[in-house]
Amino acid sequence: MPTINQLVRKGRKTAEYKSNSPALKQCPQKRGVCTVVKTSTPKKPNSALRKVARVRLTNGYEVTAYIPGIGHNLQEHSVVLIRGGRVKDLPGVRYHIVRGALDAAGVANRMQARSKYGAKKPKQK
């Protein structure tokens, strides 16, 4: 606990804001080009082959981004849109690829939570 005199001399320091997605530079999304598309294994206790892509952004940063949903059409040189949001069981993955935007196609046969996966509304019979 500081004394009044110490507060008069120094004052209180406000905590510096630290972004969880620094490569976006305060933008909601950023465009980038896939350099590598691969699978990655999660931390314990989970087990899977998670689909990730290494993406070079327009601002020069290179980040690892998660490809959500079942199946994807991404390969090297695909142009993708990146948003913030980490994947808890993949260390170092702090970004998500936006499905249904640019070269990333939406998830096929998706009925629920369609807007999150860029899936069109199915035709009514």
Curated annotation (Swiss-Prot):
Keywords: Methylation, Ribonucleoprotein, Ribosomal protein, RNA-binding, rRNA-binding, tRNA-binding. Gene3D superfamilies: Nucleic acid-binding proteins. It comes from the Bacteria. GO terms for molecular function: rRNA binding; structural constituent of ribosome; tRNA binding. The modification 3-methylthioaspartic acid is found at residue 89. Signal peptide: none annotated. Pfam families: Ribosom_S12_S23. One of its GO terms (cellular component) is small ribosomal subunit. The keyword Cell inner membrane does not apply. GO terms for biological process: translation. NCBIfam families: rpsL_bact (TIGR00981). Part of the 30S ribosomal subunit. Contacts proteins S8 and S17. May interact with IF1 in the 30S initiation complex. With S4 and S5 plays an important role in translational accuracy. Belongs to the universal ribosomal protein uS12 family. PANTHER family: 30S RIBOSOMAL PROTEIN S12 FAMILY MEMBER. This is Small ribosomal subunit protein uS12. The lineage of its organism: Bacteria, Bacillati, Bacillota, Clostridia, Eubacteriales.
